[in-house]
């Protein structure tokens, strides 16, 4: 028996090889196989958003004006979610709702579903792009792993949360003021700021900002003066073999400041990766919990005492009253299809009123 050892080579290129050569060619903007997903989806998502914010009203779904054409500006324009009556329909242009009528499709909120789904696939394509490029230049894939944090947040907020509710209607609309309204909704209906997963998310994002500021300042403070100018832009070149800054000096400085400091760059930079990504993952998990209507912390003893004693209030009980006010005022305005009417005497008032 003969065993052939060596690399198998094909005599001629097939279609796959030709596509692989073209897609992964070294050019100014790398395309790659991931680009087949990223570029079309990003193009359609952005195009749908610009189209919706420019021309499409939300009168039929939310009773609102939401386009530049109706007088909105960049902060108030939005691509709004479909009507609550449409539940979780994919709202395909050729589906039973729009029946191929583009104008009707826009009026029903079809652009939101279009932007949300293409946006999610575009983000996934961007993560795959980082995997593909890292493999091509023989890097570790930590950039792609880090980008899973924003993807988890986007998918949980825009897709999983409304899937757990009665319809896409309860997802955020794509606009600045619309996102602010959604945040108020989250606070009023889910007490989101007292949710431990939100707390971990805030700690991760703000902690990452602090770490970035400290790290950047420390590197700038400990640059080696081995060029014609001791600053980032003049003294060093991207192909130098020497270190740019002194880790030893930085370690000594922070050891004196805090009593402890990072002793090597690997642990330091892994920590800078770990803090924000874990925070984003935790907040995404929290939103998945909200999709199932899981509750935040409840301090029932304080609520009972506040109900019995008009002079007893804590910041917690005041916030609970605020949440009740958000629900009472927001539900009627935010869900006009429900025809909710709250008499003045049932609207919540603080103990001081």
Swiss-Prot record:
GO molecular function, a single term: oxygen evolving activity
GO biological process, one term: photosynthetic electron transport in photosystem II
Keyword set includes Hydrolase: no
UniProt xrefs under Gene3D superfamilies: Photosystem II protein D1-like
List of residues that carry Phosphothreonine: 2
InterPro entries the UniProt entry points to: D1/D2, Photo_II_D1/D2_sf, Photo_RC_L/M, Photo_RC_L/M_CS, PSII_PsbD/D2
Source organism superkingdom: Eukaryota
Membrane-crossing residue ranges in chain numbering: 41-61, 125-141, 153-166, 208-228, 279-295
UniProt: chlorophyll a ChlzD2 binding residues: 118
Sites where the protein binds pheophytin a: 130, 143
Annotated positions binding chlorophyll a PD2: 198
Residues where Fe cation binds: 215, 269
GO CC term (a single one): chloroplast thylakoid membrane
Main localisation: plastid
Binding site for a plastoquinone: 215, 262
Cofactor note: The D1/D2 heterodimer binds P680, chlorophylls that are the primary electron donor of PSII, and subsequent electron acceptors. It shares a non-heme iron and each subunit binds pheophytin, quinone, additional chlorophylls, carotenoids and lipids. There is also a Cl(-1) ion associated with D1 and D2, which is required for oxygen evolution. The PSII complex binds additional chlorophylls, carotenoids and specific lipids.
Enzyme Commission number, as recorded: 1.10.3.9
Cell compartments where the protein resides: Plastid, Chloroplast thylakoid membrane
Topology in the lipid bilayer: Multi-pass membrane protein
Function: Photosystem II (PSII) is a light-driven water:plastoquinone oxidoreductase that uses light energy to abstract electrons from H(2)O, generating O(2) and a proton gradient subsequently used for ATP formation. It consists of a core antenna complex that captures photons, and an electron transfer chain that converts photonic excitation into a charge separation. The D1/D2 (PsbA/PsbD) reaction center heterodimer binds P680, the primary electron donor of PSII as well as several subsequent electron acceptors. D2 is needed for assembly of a stable PSII complex.
Database matches in PANTHER family: PHOTOSYSTEM II D2 PROTEIN, PHOTOSYSTEM II PROTEIN D1
Note: 2 of the reaction center chlorophylls (ChlD1 and ChlD2) are entirely coordinated by water.
Assembly and interaction partners: PSII is composed of 1 copy each of membrane proteins PsbA, PsbB, PsbC, PsbD, PsbE, PsbF, PsbH, PsbI, PsbJ, PsbK, PsbL, PsbM, PsbT, PsbX, PsbY, PsbZ, Psb30/Ycf12, at least 3 peripheral proteins of the oxygen-evolving complex and a large number of cofactors. It forms dimeric complexes.
Name of the molecule in the record: Photosystem II D2 protein
Protein's organism: Spinacia oleracea (Spinach)
Taxonomic placement: Eukaryota, Viridiplantae, Streptophyta, Embryophyta, Tracheophyta
């Amino acid at each position: 028996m003969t065993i052939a050892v060596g690399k198998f080579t094909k005599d001629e290129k097939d279609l796959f090889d030709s596509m692989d050569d073209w897609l992964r060619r070294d050019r100014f903007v790398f395309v790659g196989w991931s680009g087949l997903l990223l570029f079309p989806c990003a193009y359609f998502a952005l195009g749908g958003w610009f189209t919706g914010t420019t021309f499409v009203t939300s009168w039929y779904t939310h009773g609102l004006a939401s386009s530049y054409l109706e007088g909105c500006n960049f902060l108030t324009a939005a691509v709004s979610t479909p009507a609550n009556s449409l539940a979780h329909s994919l709202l395909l242009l050729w589906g039973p709702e729009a029946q191929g009528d583009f104008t009707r499709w826009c009026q029903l909120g079809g652009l939101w579903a279009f932007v949300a789904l293409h946006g999610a696939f575009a983000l996934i394509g961007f993560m795959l792009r980082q995997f593909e490029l890292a493999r091509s230049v023989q890097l570790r894939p930590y950039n792609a792993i880090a980008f899973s944090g924003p993807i988890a947040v986007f998918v949980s907020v825009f897709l999983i949360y409304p899937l757990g509710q009665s319809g896409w209607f309860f997802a955020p609309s794509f606009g600045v003021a619309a996102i602010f309204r959604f945040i108020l909704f989250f606070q009023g209906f889910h007490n989101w700021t007292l949710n431990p997963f939100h707390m971990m998310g805030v700690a991760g994002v703000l902690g990452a900002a602090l770490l970035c500021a400290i790290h950047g300042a420390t590197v700038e403070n400990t640059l080696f003066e081995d060029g014609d100018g001791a600053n980032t832009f003049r003294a060093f070149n991207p192909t130098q073999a020497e270190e740019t800054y002194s880790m030893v000096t930085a370690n000594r400085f922070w050891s004196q400041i805090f009593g402890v400091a990072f002793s090597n760059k690997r642990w330091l930079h892994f920590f800078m990766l770990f803090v924000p990504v874990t925070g984003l993952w935790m907040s995404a998990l929290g939103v998945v919990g909200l999709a199932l209507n899981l509750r935040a912390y409840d301090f029932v003893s304080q609520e009972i005492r506040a109900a019995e004693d008009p002079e007893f209030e804590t910041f917690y009980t005041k916030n609970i009253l605020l949440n009740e006010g958000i629900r009472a005022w927001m539900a009627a305005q935010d869900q006009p299809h429900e025809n909710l009417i709250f008499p003045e005497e049932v609207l919540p008032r603080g103990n001081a009123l």
